[in-house]
């Protein structure tokens, strides 16, 4: 599936998702940015019905196996998660010590320029590379991949 292509996420299924930073920038090498992700995941669990079976925060992307409880929709929960975390982490980069601040903000700004949805900065790549979990073996393959 090409970057930015819409995916049909079904309401009653679990998915293996990969959320990636634009230009594969190593944002999550900083603990405060990883903490922002974890706090937001916890919020989504409590307030948006997110069910997390497995996840791993890599230096420039996140893998997770997730679904949502009714009445919530996974696509909406992930959209809100990405929107909130992009704003939060960009604010952290702007306001907290960060040796790569100017470089990262310039790249985020350049990514936002051709976009109508992103006013100043674009943090996440489009799409979630959603793969429906279709068998027990596939689920265990993905869990082992995430945790190894």
Residues covered by each model-derived region:
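Short catalytic/metal-binding and nucleic-acid-binding patches
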Residues: 1-148
């Amino acid at each position: 599936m090409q970057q930015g292509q819409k995916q049909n996420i079904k309401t009653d299924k679990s998915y293996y998702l990969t959320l990636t930073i634009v230009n594969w920038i190593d944002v999550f090498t900083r603990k405060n940015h990883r903490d922002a992700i974890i706090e937001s995941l916890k919020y989504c669990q409590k307030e948006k019905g997110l069910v997390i079976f497995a996840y791993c925060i890599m230096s420039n992307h996140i893998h997770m196996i997730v679904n949502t409880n009714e009445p919530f929709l996974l696509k909406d929960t992930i959209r809100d998660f990405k929107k909130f975390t992009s704003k939060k982490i960009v604010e952290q980069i702007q306001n907290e010590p960060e040796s790569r601040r100017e470089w990262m903000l310039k790249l985020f700004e350049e990514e936002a320029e051709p976009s109508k949805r992103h006013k100043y900065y674009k943090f996440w790549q489009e799409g979630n590379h959603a793969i429906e979990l279709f068998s027990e073996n596939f689920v265990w393959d993905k869990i082992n991949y995430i945790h190894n």
